[in-house]
């Protein structure tokens, strides 16, 4: 089972709100997911990002692939850097 970390769209029309979820890559964008690890609100100024860092690092360590947008969110939060450092054993 290929697992991805991606955004699940919520909110009303023209006011998107996203949940950062871990899901099977074959399931639909807003369909079944394994675990919710955070939220992302692009409408707020500045954009609000809340991510459970421990859960994100756990899933990255287990081989989950983040989508491009989620990878950018993780990089801005410093999660990707921590993941790469832990991979190198530092």
Swiss-Prot record:
Keywords: Ribonucleoprotein, Ribosomal protein. GO terms for biological process: translation. Pfam families: Ribosomal_S16. One of its GO terms (molecular function) is structural constituent of ribosome. InterPro entries: Ribosomal_bS16, Ribosomal_bS16_CS, Ribosomal_bS16_dom_sf. It comes from the Bacteria. One of its GO terms (cellular component) is small ribosomal subunit. Belongs to the bacterial ribosomal protein bS16 family. This is Small ribosomal subunit protein bS16. It comes from Bacillus cereus (strain ATCC 14579 / DSM 31 / CCUG 7414 / JCM 2152 / NBRC 15305 / NCIMB 9373 / NCTC 2599 / NRRL B-3711). The gene is rpsP.
């Amino acid at each position: 089972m290929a697992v991805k970390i991606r955004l699940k769209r919520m909110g009303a029309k023209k006011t998107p709100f996203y949940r950062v979820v871990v899901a099977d890559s074959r399931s639909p964008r807003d369909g079944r997911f394994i675990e919710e690890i955070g939220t992302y609100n692009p409408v707020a100024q500045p954009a609000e990002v809340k991510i459970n860092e421990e859960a994100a690092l756990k899933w990255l360590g287990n081989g989950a692939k983040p989508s491009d947008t989620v990878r950018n969110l993780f990089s801005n939060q410093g999660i990707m850097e921590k993941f790469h450092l832990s991979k190198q054993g530092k």
